[in-house]
Amino acid sequence: MALALKEAFEGTAVVLTPDLPLHPKEALKEIRSIVDREHPDLLLGNSCGAFLAQMLAPVVDIPALLGNPYFKMTEFLKERIGEHEYKAPRRDSNQRLVIEETLIEEFAELESIQFDNCTPYYKDMVWGLFGEHDAIAHFCPLFLEHYNNAFHFPGGHTPTEQEVKAWYAPLAAKMMMKFEDF
């Protein structure tokens, strides 16, 4: 997804694609540090990244595009306790991740407060993009309880390069144009 976004915006926008820590509190701190340093126009995340982006967007006052947001990470993680590998190659070459109870507890803590900063003002500043064939995350109804703009694309949970270029990139560009004076 990161490479496809970089290609889609080549010459028009800088796309930052950090390898985030597994633990969500550390990941939020890292994203916040990047935001403070780089001043991006938009946050964009998929799945767990969308979970993090929607929590941080109103705090840092930046619009966000959430791709297939997974708002109940604890449910997902409880079924996957143990050692796994990241789907995409990481810059540090560490492909190993371990899901354990402390990680699940940290996500549970954040899940309980994830919508606390969602204000009426932000209902139009956070957009959701949902794959019609997503077999993992089905959170469009929950999204619409908090936000107004939901879009659908004919894909699954993890978008292909073509889906990123056809759906994610155009919506991100539209958001950046809409909120450019923000």
Predicted regions and their residues:
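Active-site catalytic motif of lipid deacylating hydrolases and related acyltransferases
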Residues: 1-37, 157
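Active-site signature of alpha/beta-hydrolase-fold catalytic machinery across serine-
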Residues: 4, 55, 59
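A generic structural signal for well-ordered alpha-helical segments
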Residues: 9, 35, 56-57, 143-144
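Glycine-rich phosphate-binding loop signature in dinucleotide/nucleotide-binding domains
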Residues: 36-39, 179
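Residue in the alpha/beta-hydrolase core beta-strand immediately N-terminal to the catalytic nucleophile
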Residues: 41-44, 63-65
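Gly/Ala-rich beta-loop-alpha elbow adjacent to hydrolase catalytic centers
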Residues: 44-53
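The alpha/beta-hydrolase serine catalytic core
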Residues: 63-65, 69-182
